[in-house]
């Protein structure tokens, strides 16, 4: 398969919302390769929302939200094979791994979108780790009283990147994922309601609320 490269810095957009941070190359290529083998062995099933079956497949640990009853139902605990990733995220943020109460692994087949939403209120801060394929996250104010395309911020998510949504970015904004061009996986880690995570320390490959927020994604083969 041809290698796909993306240019993430060819357009300047408004700053990211407060509480939103993205870092590139959170995982090394070797870590990504090993983690993909772990993810592909998980028992995925189709995501469902109020009777609708989505194209996205998921594996949920530490609870599964039932959208028909709006309740959090039990699900298996996180498998030990995901502990190295959880621990790496915890070190990045300077927190104890036990603060992550929920892990959701999602598989996006080519062309799979994720609609506008805020994450369920049972959880607080969100950390996402991106693998294999690139994606575009869109963010807009919540509630969107008079939604316009010009009000949407677009954030390119390259493979091996990680992002944080906490505080205002978590509660005052919605996000969605544009239809993906290639197979991708994401691992989302969440804390319990009321347990807000700190932002990670600044680094050279990090986009922060006061800096560049989005880019057009160009694929070159």
Regions found by a protein language model. Name each.
Residues 1-221:
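Non-heme Fe(II) oxygenase metal-center motifs and adjacent flexible, charged/small-residue loops
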């Amino acid at each position: 398969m041809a290698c796909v490269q993306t240019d993430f810095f060819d357009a300047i957009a408004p700053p990211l919302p407060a509480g939103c941070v993205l870092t590139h190359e959170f995982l090394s290529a070797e870590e990504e390769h090993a983690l993909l083998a772990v993810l592909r062995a998980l028992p995925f099933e189709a995501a469902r929302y109020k009777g609708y079956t989505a194209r996205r497949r998921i594996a949920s640990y530490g609870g599964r939200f039932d959208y028909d009853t709006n309740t959090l139902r039990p699900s298996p605990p996180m498998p030990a094979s995901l502990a190295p990733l959880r621990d790496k995220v915890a070190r990045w943020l300077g927190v104890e791994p036990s603060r992550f109460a929920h892990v959701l692994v999602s598989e996006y087949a080519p062309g799979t979108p994720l609609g506008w939403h805020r994450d369920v209120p049972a959880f607080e801060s969100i950390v996402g780790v991106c693998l294999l394929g690139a994606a575009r996250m869109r963010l807009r104010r919540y509630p969107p009283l008079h939604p316009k395309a010009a009000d949407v911020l677009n954030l390119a998510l390259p493979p091996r990147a990680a992002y944080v949504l906490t505080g205002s970015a978590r509660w005052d904004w919605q996000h969605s994922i544009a239809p993906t061009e290639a197979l991708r996986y994401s691992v989302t880690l969440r804390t319990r309601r009321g347990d807000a995570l700190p932002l990670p320390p600044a680094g050279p490959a990090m986009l922060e609320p006061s800096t560049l927020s989005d880019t057009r994604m160009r694929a070159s083969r």
